[in-house]
Regions:
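Charge-biased low-complexity segments
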Residues: 1-116
Length: 116
């Protein structure tokens, strides 16, 4: 999970508010990865067609902490749709801040779809 820029205070995932400031980024990454694993469903049609690959998802954590502007790039529309569904289900966050003010923070994350 990569923020596209550097901010004084990165967004904070719910339940990461109580960790030390130096650990909030690690907590954020762990919680996002856990969210992806928990909500991941391989699209049936993609399984049947043997489609796999990596979908790159770009999104913004807005000034109010909501997830907006979800954009995907991947090998198949069904995989892209599932990646958007997973990211769209992320909870509202504590927004990132610059000079004490909430700011929009762009993120990029790859989601890998691999058949077993």
């Amino acid at each position: 999970v990569l923020p596209s820029a550097v901010f004084e205070d990165s967004p904070i995932f719910p339940c990461c508010e109580r960790v030390f400031k130096s650990k909030t980024r690690v907590c954020f990454q762990e919680k996002i990865n856990m969210h992806i694993r928990k909500n991941f469903r391989y699209p049936e049609i993609a399984q049947e067609m043997g489609i796999q690959g990596r979908v790159y998802v770009n999104f913004i954590i807005s000034k109010d902490g909501s997830i907006t502007n979800i954009r995907m790039r991947g090998p198949d529309k069904n995989l892209e749709k599932e990646a958007a569904r997973i990211i769209g289900r992320l909870p509202n966050m504590t927004p990132g801040k610059q000079r004490g003010r909430p700011v929009r923070v762009p993120f990029s994350i790859p989601i890998t779809f691999r058949l077993q």
